[in-house]
């Protein structure tokens, strides 16, 4: 399995160092790694082999090897393959939900307010944000992948791409409008980094 590093990661590190937010960036990257391991574990359980893991500024991305030697069999079982891909896509956000639930339980029933110097509230909030962001119906985010696979099962691959692309574009336009408003209203340039 190959490990690839996008050079923009170092730019993000520099920005978060300069703004003294490196602790938050480190937390988000750790949570993103755990999130991505959810995809890897689900993929392995469902019979896929991880080909590469890319480290990108906003986290990690795993690519699975698509074995095409039994292509006709895959076409016959296309719906099962699409369902497996949807399960793999949901596995990452599901990991964030589990971490968030455990954090909430720790926060409610114990006196623990920090884990390794990180406040439980920040852990809950970070996992919630990662979950919400990844479940947006924007391809190639997890929500977009799930949408594509579910539409694929019902209407076929071509229609799945068309519908997913249209929904992705609409959601991106809406998010860009909200982000533009937020930048103007709150004068927070960090929102630009999120959009990029």
Question: Where are each of the predicted segments found?
Answer:
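Small-residue-rich helix-interface/hinge motifs
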Residues: 3-5, 17-76, 122-126, 130, ...
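Membrane interface segments of multi-pass transport proteins and intramembrane proteases
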Residues: 107-120, 149-164
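Transmembrane helix-loop-helix
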Residues: 179-196
């Amino acid at each position: 399995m190959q490990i690839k590093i996008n050079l923009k990661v170092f730019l993000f590190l520099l920005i978060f160092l300069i703004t003294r937010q490196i602790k938050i960036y480190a937390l988000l990257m750790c949570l993103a790694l755990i999130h991505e391991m959810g995809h890897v574990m689900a993929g392995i359980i469902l019979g896929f082999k991880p080909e590469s893991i890319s480290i990108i500024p906003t986290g990690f991305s795993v690519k699975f090897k698509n074995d095409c030697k039994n292509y006709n069999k895959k076409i016959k079982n296309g719906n099962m393959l699409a369902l497996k891909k949807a399960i793999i896509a949901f596995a990452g956000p599901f990991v964030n939900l589990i971490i968030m639930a455990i954090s909430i339980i720790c926060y409610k029933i114990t006196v623990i307010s920090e884990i390794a110097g990180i406040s439980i509230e920040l852990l809950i909030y970070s996992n919630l944000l990662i979950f919400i962001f990844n479940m947006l119906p924007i391809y190639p985010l997890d929500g977009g992948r799930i949408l594509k696979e579910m539409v694929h099962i019902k209407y076929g691959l071509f229609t799945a791409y068309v519908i997913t692309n249209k929904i992705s574009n609409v959601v991106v336009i809406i998010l860009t409008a909200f982000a533009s408003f937020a930048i103007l209203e709150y004068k927070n340039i960090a929102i630009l980094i999120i959009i990029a």
